[in-house]
Amino acid sequence: MKRSMYAGRVREEHIGTTITLKGWVSRRRDLGGLIFIDLRDREGVMQLVINPEEVSSDVMATAERLRSEYVIEVEGFVEARQQANDKLATGMVELKVSALTILNTAKTTPFEIKDDVEVSDDTRLRYRYLDLRRPEMLENFKLRAKVTHSIRNYLDDLEFIDVETPMLTKSTPEGARDYLVPSRVSQGHFYALPQSPQITKQLLMNAGFDRYYQIVKCFRDEDLRGDRQPEFTQVDLETSFLSEQEIQDIVEGMIAKVMKETKEIDVTLPFPRMSYDVAMNSYGSDKPDTRFEMLLQDLTVTVNGIDFKVFSEAPAVKAIVVKGNADRYSRKDIDKLTEFAKQFGAKGLAWVKVTDGQLAGPVAKFLIAIETELSSQLKLAENDLVLFVADTLEVANNTLGALRNRIAKDLDMIDQSQFNFLWVVDWPMFEWSEEEGRYMSAHHPFTLPTPESAHELEGDLAKVRAIAYDIVLNGYELGGGSLRINQKEMQERMFKALGFTADEANDQFGFLLEAMDYGFPPHGGLAIGLDRFVMLLAGKGNIREVIAFPKNNKASDPMTQAPSLVSENQLEELSLQIESHD
């Protein structure tokens, strides 16, 4: 029989009609001779009633065989429920079954198919096809589909061209580790799965496409966390002849459309702008969460000269004030915060509390001479807790920024209903890598430096600024972009600044440099992490909740057992040998 509609869409207007439904048995109950079935499909749950006095003995026998997650087909008459269930969209109606067919049986599931089920993450991933049956998960993917639909419509209306770029590309340095794919035809050579379509989308601008977009899979072999996966999806944009502001206007319009169509929220445009330096110095992060205060305070000058060498001899002394919550933190709690601070390079964590109008705590005696000035600068009040970090400016900022976020979550200071977007601009072009012992690109080596700082490519790289911009949402980097280099001479200078010899630059990026000989237009773009965006819209804490078949924290798939061993024949075809490291 043909299905009449989704079970979750049956409403009062269907009362008096005969319909056919198909789906899964969510629950079966036997009450007073009647059998009640909760039938679940993609759109929700519908109650079925099987009355032995109104159906054949075959139907009754079939109904008695039903168990959870059996797949069934039913025909029946829609009636009003005697006792409505206002927790269900279908709660005003029920289906009196006249015909019933079992389409497939099911074993007992390893966990109950319902929201808020207590089960390990690996078990959820091992049986992901069951996990995805849960209504909460289905809603996540409906939201994701609405987001991508909204984005495509918006960009199509602005005459962006959707172009697919290669999945098998060339491995290049300056980024995360590549996933490599050995070539059977060119033995000893490898493709790389793209970390982004960065260079190919730039080449599309050289081809005259003017406006490109793609919702594209990307791959990075990096350590995983809650908002990262080895394969992820980004909304990738590139434009020709547009300014930084014009590109940002397009992106803001796209996000405003998504927010309106998926959350019914009118966001205020334009988004606030904050320089990288302000973000780091005031929030301790290049992706600041602006939903709460607790800004970092610079006390380096204030404490200069006091009789406490930890402060007076430190390159920087900064603090955050936890307003009105000192009594929430015992010595043991502060010790835990100290251990947390050490993860970010801090040697320790100094602290004082405001108790009975005076500073109290391990370092209070060293602050007596500046207590009035300190209290005024920090606007201290009774029951405030002050946390200090004395170290390099970088360590102080990073440590207090992390503490700020942790404490705000611990004290439930964040309004979870808010969506605070902002642009972080005026980025440094390079960042120092202790591991590499050299400067590396803060974004990528194709970013255009500001005209005022470009001369420092041959001087102090720390002074080079980039025409780059990140879009931030609630403390997460939603995406990043920049204007790109389109002049060959500037691109060669950039490669040289990064330590490439001319031969190395030509070997890795010769095709791009050659393209710059043929009228490369000014261009720029941006990429937004789609998984992360949907995660935040759905109010989830991990992007696994919005990716259909994600990997676990070991970059493995417990369901398919990927990655897996391959046969010796496959390795021989590729001229590969596996060395044991036992």
UniProtKB/Swiss-Prot annotation:
GO cellular component: cytoplasm
EC number(s) per entry: 6.1.1.12
Species whose genome carries this gene: Streptococcus pyogenes serotype M28 (strain MGAS6180)
Quaternary data: Homodimer.
Keyword set, alphabetical order: Aminoacyl-tRNA synthetase, ATP-binding, Cytoplasm, Ligase, Nucleotide-binding, Protein biosynthesis
PANTHER family per the UniProt record, alphabetical: ASPARTATE--TRNA LIGASE, MITOCHONDRIAL (PTHR22594:SF5), ASPARTYL/LYSYL-TRNA SYNTHETASE (PTHR22594)
Highest taxon in the source lineage: Bacteria
Binding residues for L-aspartate: E174, R220, H443, R484
Biological process according to GO: aspartyl-tRNA aminoacylation
Function: Catalyzes the attachment of L-aspartate to tRNA(Asp) in a two-step reaction: L-aspartate is first activated by ATP to form Asp-AMP and then transferred to the acceptor end of tRNA(Asp).
Major localisation: cytoplasm
Gene for this chain: aspS
Subcellular localization: Cytoplasm
Binding-site positions, ATP: R220, D221, E222, Q229, E477, G529, L530, D531, R532
Name this polypeptide is given: Aspartate--tRNA ligase
One MF annotation (Gene Ontology) recorded for this entry: catalytic activity, acting on a protein
Record-stated family: Belongs to the class-II aminoacyl-tRNA synthetase family. Type 1 subfamily.
Keyword Ligase: yes
